[in-house]
């Protein structure tokens, strides 16, 4: 499943295609959304927001389209009039004069008013988004030490969207490698230096992935361009200590780590 950085980049692509342009045609597959087709035609997409792995498409009339891709959903941008070659099932089409965005295969799609946004179950449950520039390491540290999260092992905590939205398995693996910790640790057991390092890494690595992942420069490291240090690198040499990276399973997900330098 895509993680926060990939979802945010997808939102950026959608915004670049249709933001601020009048919608010339709107189509929804689900019957409960059909009444909104006429209400949205002629309106503008004002912004596309991410909350972890959910997308919120905000319209100029105050409505917001909530969508969660889950495992199978995918957005596409096409030229208006183009007929995509795909076997996927179309769920949403938002069309402007020159560009059209399409949502395929997703099933978790709703139209929300401003009031409903504040009471939506997923949006109420999800924690602060790691890509929200307003979120600080100090706030992350406070969440780590809060009664709700301080006794949770990192193996599960770093996959819990209620803790921090936008984290996922590759980020969990890379963050814990960066700070030299295993997934069995809990925040309550860390010293001050470890807490500070983890609080920064929980923001720095997702943000680095968002801004630079996919740019090719294998000589760069965290702090310059993002690339995997341990994820999918089992059997390879750890660049930090020379140990051999191993693969196991934690919280029912593949976990990659270096037993020599992650303690």
Swiss-Prot record:
The lineage of its organism: Bacteria, Pseudomonadati, Pseudomonadota, Gammaproteobacteria, Enterobacterales. NCBIfam families: PRK10445.1. PROSITE patterns: FPG_CAT (PS51068), ZF_FPG_1 (PS01242), ZF_FPG_2 (PS51066). Its cofactor is Zn(2+). This is Endonuclease 8. Involved in base excision repair of DNA damaged by oxidation or by mutagenic agents. Acts as a DNA glycosylase that recognizes and removes damaged bases. Has a preference for oxidized pyrimidines, such as thymine glycol, 5,6-dihydrouracil and 5,6-dihydrothymine. Has AP (apurinic/apyrimidinic) lyase activity and introduces nicks in the DNA strand. Cleaves the DNA backbone by beta-delta elimination to generate a single-strand break at the site of the removed base with both 3'- and 5'-phosphates. DNA binds at residues 70, 125, 169. It holds the Pfam family zf-FPG_IleRS. The active site is at residues 2-3, 53, 253.
């Amino acid at each position: 499943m895509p993680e926060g950085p990939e979802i945010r980049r997808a939102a950026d692509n959608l915004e670049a295609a249709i933001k601020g342009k009048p919608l010339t045609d709107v189509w929804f597959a689900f019957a409960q959304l059909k009444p909104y087709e006429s209400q949205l035609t002629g309106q503008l997409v004002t912004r596309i927001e991410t909350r972890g792995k959910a997308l919120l498409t905000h319209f100029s009339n105050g409505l917001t389209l909530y969508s969660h891709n889950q495992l199978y959903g995918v957005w596409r941008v096409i030229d208006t009039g183009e007929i995509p070659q795909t076997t996927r099932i179309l769920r949403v089409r938002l069309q402007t004069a020159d560009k059209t965005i399409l949502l395929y295969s997703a099933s978790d799609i709703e139209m929300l008013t401003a009031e409903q946004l504040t009471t939506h179950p997923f949006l109420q449950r999800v924690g602060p988004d790691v890509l929200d520039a307003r979120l600080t390491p100090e706030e992350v540290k406070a969440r780590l030490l809060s009664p709700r999260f301080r006794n949770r092992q990192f193996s599960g905590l770093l996959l819990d969207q209620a803790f921090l939205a936008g984290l996922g398995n590759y980020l969990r693996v890379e963050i814990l490698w960066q700070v030299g910790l295993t997934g069995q640790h809990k925040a309550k057991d860390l010293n001050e230096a470890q807490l500070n390092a983890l609080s920064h890494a929980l923001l720095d690595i997702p943000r680095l992935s968002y801004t630079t992942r996919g740019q090719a420069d294998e000589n760069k490291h965290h702090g310059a361009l993002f690339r995997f240090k341990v994820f999918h690198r089992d059997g390879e040499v750890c660049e930090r200590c020379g140990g051999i990276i191993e693969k196991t399973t934690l919280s029912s997900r593949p976990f990659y780590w270096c037993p020599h330098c992650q303690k």
